[in-house]
């Protein structure tokens, strides 16, 4: 089942300064779709478009189920100066109309998973970048939506944090959630994503599973990195 269907003819922050062109893809239940490309390729802009945050867009973003909820986990942590970690979680639970019992159970489980339980009464603005990234992951996964939109989740995560994140990804996919994740970490993406959307200069140069990407790049045994470089060379 499609959780979101994206059809962007063009998009940008100004109508006269378009960034995206001819972007079409879907995210299905149980999928982890990797939005792959270098810095400045348009990955974050595509995510903003999916969420309706781009000032100009010609096209359509369709959520077939009107009741589909999504969680957005940004690349840069967004935190309140005067709220403790626990208060951040309480606030998110209140916005999501989560019962107190469910909130406490999920929050404590995630805090322990990411080894932040002892820090729950501290201010996250004083945390390291990696710890702040874990806070954003906890906030997103605590809500258990049908769709996760995740922007560069690996930046700042230590190996334990990355393992914990990947464990959660497997769990929510098994529960039927879909994930749209942008990253330029091709080695990790190759290992975990079910399909890929390769972006260059605001347009799709290839998409599909790894086998399809290999066929399109004419590298039958190539890594995702090698395939991406080959496809870029074909564009030039």
Language model regions located:
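Conserved ABC ATPase "signature" region
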Residues: 90, 94, 101-119
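Catalytic Walker B motif of ABC-type/P-loop ATPase nucleotide-binding domains
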Residues: 148-152
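The feature captures the beta-strand-to-loop junction immediately N-terminal to the Walker
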Residues: 36-38
């Amino acid at each position: 089942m499609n959780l979101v269907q994206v059809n962007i003819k063009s998009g940008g922050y100004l109508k006269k300064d378009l960034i995206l062109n001819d972007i079409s893809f879907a995210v299905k239940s149980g999928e982890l779709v990797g939005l792959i490309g270098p810095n400045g390729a348009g990955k974050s802009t595509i995510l903003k478009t999916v969420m309706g945050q781009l000032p100009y867009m010609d096209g359509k973003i369709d959520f077939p189920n009107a009741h589909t909820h999504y969680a957005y986990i940004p690349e840069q942590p967004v935190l309140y100066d005067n709220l403790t970690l626990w208060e951040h979680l309480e606030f998110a639970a209140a916005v999501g109309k989560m019962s107190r019992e469910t909130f406490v159970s999920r929050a404590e489980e995630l805090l322990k998973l990411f080894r932040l339980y002892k820090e729950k009464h501290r201010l996250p603005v004083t945390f390291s970048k990696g710890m702040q990234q874990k806070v954003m992951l906890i906030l997103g996964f605590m809500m258990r939506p049908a769709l996760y939109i995740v922007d560069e989740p690996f930046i700042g995560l230590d190996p334990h944090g990355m393992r914990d994140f990947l464990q959660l990804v497997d769990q929510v996919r098994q529960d039927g959630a879909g994930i749209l994740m942008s990253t330029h970490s091709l080695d990790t993406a190759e290992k975990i994503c079910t399909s890929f959307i390769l972006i260059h200069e605001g347009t799709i140069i290839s998409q599909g599973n790894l086998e399809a990407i290999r066929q399109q790049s004419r590298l039958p045994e190539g890594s995702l990195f090698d395939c991406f470089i080959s496809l870029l060379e074909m564009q030039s």
